[in-house]
Amino acid sequence: MAQAHKESVLAAACVRTPVNPYTKAPLALYERELGERQQQRTASVSPQRLPRTSMGTPAAPAAALDWEEARCCKSRRCQDWVFDISKVHHPDKDYYVQVEKLKKAHLQNMEQLEKMYDKKLHLSGVHNPENEQGVVREVYRSAWEPKSVLPAEYDDKYLKHSLSGSVSPSLSESSHESTNGDSSDSEHSVSARNKILDMWNEFTVEDYIRNSEYFSKEIAKNKTSKKSKEWSHKITIPEPFQMTIRESKKKEMNIKSKSEIELENNLLKKKLEEEAECQKKFRANPVPSSVYLPLYQEIVERNEERRSFVKEKSKDILLATQKPFQFIEREERKKTLRLDFMNLSTSVPSANHFKAKPVPKSIYGTSTAERLKEEELYRGIRIHMRAQELLQNSSYPTITLAPGAHSGTKKGKCYKPKEKQKHKPKISATIPHSQTMHENQQKRLPESTSTKHVTVCEPFQLRTSNIPSHKEKIIMDIQADEENLKETRWPYKSPRAQARIHSSAGTLNPQGEALCNIPRSTELSKRREHAIRKREKQRTKDYMKELEAMEQRVLNKPLLIERVAQRNALMSAEKQYLNVLRDLGLSEEFVSKNGQSASVDEHVSVREENNPRAESTEGTLVLEDLLDDAEKYQTDPESEEAQEEDAYSTDEDHSMEEI
């Protein structure tokens, strides 16, 4: 198969189709035949072709000969600079020529189809109204046909040029006239200018004035010359198509087509085959023994063995190719050196000498309380200095300098209950003198501008006294709440209090609503607030006293260095005393019997049992001694919490005391 395909491809590659010499495109068979016919026609055309006049009629022979001689002379003069335009490739021209040919062929086909349709209608006996207008259609036929932009003769020339590949008609005419001369010289003797002149010589105006007034008049004359038939009233009766009639007849006669018959035969064959298959008897083969073999388990075990073998093999390969990192070796060397150093340090006993830390600088400085007092004093001095500077640089407010500002303070914008004025304004009967008032104002003006008044703060006028209140009822409610409900006393809302219904709720403004929501200050609430403030002040005083006492205890307490030195001195004295007793040969029992320094002996014996290396310390302080000392001076945290609870109390305790 592959060899046959290769041979066919090779044969197809060897075959070369003919190519158009102008477009270099492959030519089809019908195009080649048309080209050959066109060449034969051009060869058979006589060389004595006469030119046409401007009106389309053939010219006289003498005039034609003179015209041909003049054109030959012109062509001989221009032989040196002539450029053969026939040899230039014009693909657009060939394309448009082919399009015109196709249009003409299409029109011819449509005419043939129309004639065939008319014949069929005539045979079937159907009246064709178009036959009556056949004459008119023939008149307008020339107008319907599409014309090219160029004249008819010019199109024919270029059509011959495109099909046969020969020279233009003008060039062929000159070549036929000079038959005795050389063919090669005649082909190159025509120039572009001569070709353009040939076009204008063969130009006719009739090709471009088909739609003119003259042409329309001729068509009108032809119409009037023919007799017009009278109009006859007829009704169009629709008739069915022949194919519908034929199909209906077939259905009535129950005639089946060949394809339907074949389809029925195939269906019958299939049914018979299926019935034959269903009637056959069969017996199933026994189940093969290979089905019962545990093949899956064997495959799984084999895979597991292979996986474990590959794992071990890869591990061995990795261990064989593994190389330790440099930092691992370095760390191992460090570990060995560290262990050696530890062994040396344990073998050689070293004397641990106590080295005290330097005394902090805060001990020699002033105490924190004194520093705080100094900072407070400096802060007060700075505040006082700043207040004096602001007082000197301050100016009197510009609002107070306005007319009427010195008469009184500005009235606050607050809600006032509408009350009727009991007094009437006094109207002065005297008219003030404007000139004197102006002079007095001019005198007071420099004084007010030179002096800088200090802003005076006045107390707020909240107008709470103007609000009506039921003091007795409020006091009774508060007392009842304190006796029965501790959690619902003032300032919390009492459940027994009746909701006040405002009759003028819709007419109140936002300021009045805000004032109604403000809790009212009573004498009892003022007394309670005063007592709370007093207790807070007492608590702060007690707290400050306790802080001072704590600071005093810390200052009076000896320093850790002093305590360590005292303890070391005591221990060295006790040790020296024991050494003296040992040198004298006295035992501890003798000392205990006599009751001398019994407590000291017990302390020393316990310390020797716990620390056998105490002899090498030479009377220095050990970490255990510091811990014991810290335990002595350490206070119990629970006792401190109890003391703090006794010293400070919460608001709940005060509330319980009030109850």
From Swiss-Prot:
A Gene Ontology term for the protein's cellular component: cilium
Compositionally biased tracts (Basic residues): 408-426
Keywords, in A-Z order: Cell projection, Cilium, Cilium biogenesis/degradation, Coiled coil, Cytoplasm, Cytoskeleton
InterPro entries: FAM161, FAM161A/B
Gene Ontology biological-process annotations: cell projection organization
Amino acid composition bias (Basic and acidic residues), ranges on this chain: 600-616
Protein origin, superkingdom: Eukaryota
Sequence segments annotated as region (Disordered): 34-59, 165-190, 401-428, 594-659
Coiled-coil residue windows: 96-120, 531-557
Compartmental location: Cytoplasm, Cytoskeleton, Cilium basal body; Cell projection, Cilium; Cytoplasm, Cytoskeleton, Microtubule organizing center, Centrosome, Centriole
Stretches with biased composition (Acidic residues): 637-650
Keyword Chaperone: no
Record function comment: Involved in ciliogenesis.
Family as reported in the entry's similarity comment: Belongs to the FAM161 family.
Protein's recorded name: Protein FAM161A
